A protein has these predicted regions:
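Interdomain "pre-motor" coupling segment immediately N-terminal to P-loop NTPase/helicase cores
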Residues: 14-58
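N-terminal pre-Walker A segment at the start of P-loop NTPase domains
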Residues: 67-84
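Phosphate-binding P-loop
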Residues: 86-93
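Walker A/P-loop nucleotide-binding motif
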Residues: 95-107
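Walker A/P-loop
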Residues: 104-119
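Loop/turn-to-beta-strand initiation segments
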Residues: 123, 154-157, 186-190
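Short glycine-rich substrate-engagement loop in P-loop NTPases that contacts/grips substrate
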Residues: 126-152
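Single conserved hydrophobic/aromatic residue that forms the stacking wall/gate
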Residues: 227-236
Length: 236
């Protein structure tokens, strides 16, 4: 009979109940039904969060618990670790920009903050700069760019990782500028780069475009510097 009950629960899409109904103590009808419904709601919320994490596009999952905070991480005046990790920057649509050389933990920190946002039910998208640029070119060539940009409007936080690793094609640079401009005061960005702003023209290939992009970015941004010594990867 128990197996039949579980089968029927799954047939009517009550997987949470099917997993845990045997462990629910019966005291009275209202209490029992309430506990069963809680099981189902918890299961559905967990499944929703898992789907959001999968569709966010993270390359590797990293958590804040795994990140090592140290004196080599320089936060700007007025920004605290808690303000970032508690996601307070999302409410005023502020940006976080992590700058530093390779191996300083920029991508880890960006990923971990974005993952926490996902786990709190916020819609997130993670891209590398080169990957997003190529995707924008592809969508533009296929005539589906507007649909893609429309889908980004539903996202609360966009991560653009590794600006500076690969120079961008002129058309790709202009499209990436459009994405960043569209985010201005509408959603938050987390950007990582191994280059100072003064070197971004080597990525975007146009001084005027670069100047406009940087000006737009830094208006509502917290710029965090991550140095190479000590490196979060080297501390155990």
């Amino acid at each position: 009979m128990a197996e039949q009950i579980e089968l029927m629960m799954r047939q009517v899409k009550l997987g949470g109940m099917a997993k845990g109904w045997r462990s629910v103590r019966y005291e009275n009808t209202e209490q029992y039904v309430t506990e069963l419904l809680k099981l189902e709601l918890q299961e559905r919320e967990a499944n929703r969060i898992n789907r959001m994490v999968k569709t966010a596009g993270f390359r590797v999952l990293k958590t804040l618990d795994e990140f090592v905070w140290n004196s080599a991480i320089q936060l700007p005046s007025g920004l605290t670790q808690e303000y970032m990790t508690d996601l307070h920057f999302l409410t005023p649509k502020e940006n976080l920009i992590f700058m530093g050389t390779v191996g300083t933990g920029k991508t880890h920190l960006a990923t971990a903050i974005a993952l926490k946002a996902c786990q709190e039910g916020r819609k997130v998208q993670f891209f590398t700069a080169a990957g997003l640029a190529n995707l924008l070119l592809e969508k533009n060539n296929k005539g589906t760019l507007n649909n893609f940009l429309g889908s980004l409007k539903k996202v609360e936080l966009i991560v653009i990782d590794e600006i500076g690793f690969v120079p961008l094609h002129k058309d790709a640079a202009e499209l990436l500028f459009q994405v960043i401009s569209d985010c201005y005061e509408r959603k938050s960005l987390i950007i990582t780069s191994n280059l100072e702003f003064s070197q971004w023209n080597t990525v975007f290939g146009d001084n005027r475009l670069t100047a406009a992009l940087v000006d737009r970015l830094i208006h509502h941004s917290h710029i965090c510097l991550l140095y190479t010594s000590p490196s979060p990867r080297d501390i155990s």
